[in-house]
Amino acid sequence: MEIRTGKHEDVASITDIFNFYIEHTNSRFEEVPFTLENRQKWFSQFSSTTKYQLYVATENGVLLGFACSQQYRAISAFDDTVEVTVYLAQEAKGKGLGSKLYTQLFSSIRAYGCLLYTSYT
């Protein structure tokens, strides 16, 4: 298993994972599946030189999950805040992969002053 920075060619697999959650769970609030074009635009926000980063986990060329940090809210009071997300393919659940993705993501974004705070609702 490899964890690496997300690449443009990962967008189709990421879209498939997102769409599973849209279509089969209440984890996302979208009612219509994402398009490849929509996710390509979404992908453009990530860079390994900013606090907005994307990591993917692959095994034997198959993308099993991803974790990312994104803008939290588009208001200046939250400029120093990021929202972090992890999604896994169904066959990758329960194997510690989400924790490994989060560990890599948190390690990388700390260099940009991001700290981890947990909010429970």
Question: Which sequence ranges carry the predicted segments?
Answer:
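A short beta-loop-alpha structural element at the N-terminal edge
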Residues: E2-I14
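Acetyl-CoA-dependent GNAT
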Residues: H8, P33-E91, Y102-T103, S107-S108, ...
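Short, solvent-exposed beta-strand edge segments and adjacent coil->beta transition regions
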Residues: M1, N26, T81-E83, C114-L116
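Conserved beta-strand positions that form and line the central face of beta-propeller blades
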Residues: E2-T5, R28, V56
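Conserved GNAT-fold acetyl-CoA-binding loop/helix
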Residues: T15, N19-F43
